[in-house]
Amino acid sequence: MKILVAMSGGVDSTVTAYKLKNLGHEVIGCYMKLHGKPNYHEENIKKVEKVANFLQIPYHILDLQEDFKNKVYMPFVDTYKEGKTPNPCALCNRFIKLGKLLEFAKSLGCEKLATGHYARLENNLIKTAVDESKDQSYFLASADKEALKYLIFPLGEMKKEDVKKFASTIEVLKSFATQKESSEICFVEDTYVQVLDQFMDTKIPGEVLDSSGKVVGKHEGYMHYTIGKRRGFEVRGAHEPHFVLKINPKQNQIIVGTKEELKISEFNLKNINLFIDAKELDCEVKIRYRSKSTPCKVEIYEDKSAKITLKDPVYGLASGQMAVFYDHDKVIASGFIE
């Protein structure tokens, strides 16, 4: 089978390419240039070239910087401007890795696209990985349903420690087993605010309000805050911790309150991404990557919006983040929180 492998220069994509080549597939590597972070690509491309030469496979360098800027980078900036919390990895998977890269794979005549994600596929549904601590099904849940039939995740049945051990047994790949793992957001060096600073003044002080609308303090600029944050703002006369409940970007205000006020029992989605045919769901939902799943009921409307009612309340639901719905270990839907 002719397979395009997304290669980053990391241990996961390297072992993915190695395993598929060893199984006798016709493997082609591809490195994606997504952003212009200084010295980032040169080092990675050297690693990809080293692996490609060792495996005796061809590889391509695909410049997707313009697509990435339009579909991931600027929406990241704009979402923070709107006082919401973006999910760039989910957008990148849908539009870039499982979008533009898949188009490129098809243009080369490849039957499948393989990535080093920790996830599995079964009956055209994404499943959680064997290694729960590294499971990436949450970020893949934004994928177009039609893309799933072209995908392979060879590491889905492996634990990360075994992937590293495997690489360490092969002389040429030993260095990949010990290299530092990449950060979650590839274009963020230290903090997201440093990215925003390139486009706007993020340090404009504003008012802190309590939930009744009373001014109780000051903050250093609304873009420094996300829902649930409890530091970096002043609350006069507070005797218990206060958390960000809401952000009003136009007024440069943040509304704060107690942990109890952070509780949410229902929320809405727009443009639900369904992997099964349904008008309602009785399932579990994750409201952020590292959160535990919570039982819920989902009502889906004609315009693809949805209302979610939670069995137990959650804390710190952030508008702009992705909610992912599971039937046990299978992803059945996803959508961005309004």
From Swiss-Prot:
Q: Which InterPro entries match?
A: MnmA-like, MnmA-like_C, MnmA-like_central, MnmA-like_central_sf, Rossmann-like_a/b/a_fold
Instruction: Tell me which residues are marked as the site Interaction with tRNA.
Output: 117, 321
Q: What keywords does the record list, in alphabetical order? A: ATP-binding, Cytoplasm, Disulfide bond, Nucleotide-binding, RNA-binding, Transferase, tRNA processing, tRNA-binding
Q: List the disulfide bonds.
A: 92-186
Q: Which GO terms describe its molecular function?
A: ATP binding; tRNA binding; tRNA-uridine 2-sulfurtransferase activity
Could you name the active-site residues? 92, 186
Q: Which GO terms describe its biological process?
A: tRNA wobble position uridine thiolation
Tell me the domain of life.
Bacteria
- Name the segments for region: Interaction with tRNA: 134-136, 288-289
Give the main EC class. Answer: transferase
Q: What is its main location?
A: cytoplasm
Q: Which Pfam families match?
A: tRNA_Me_trans (PF03054), tRNA_Me_trans_C (PF20258), tRNA_Me_trans_M (PF20259)
Q: So what does this thing catalyse? A: S-sulfanyl-L-cysteinyl-[protein] + uridine(34) in tRNA + AH2 + ATP = 2-thiouridine(34) in tRNA + L-cysteinyl-[protein] + A + AMP + diphosphate + H(+)
State its role.
Answer: Catalyzes the 2-thiolation of uridine at the wobble position (U34) of tRNA, leading to the formation of s(2)U34.
Membership in a protein family: Belongs to the MnmA/TRMU family.
Q: What is this protein called?
A: tRNA-specific 2-thiouridylase MnmA
Upper classification of the organism: Bacteria, Pseudomonadati, Campylobacterota, Epsilonproteobacteria, Campylobacterales
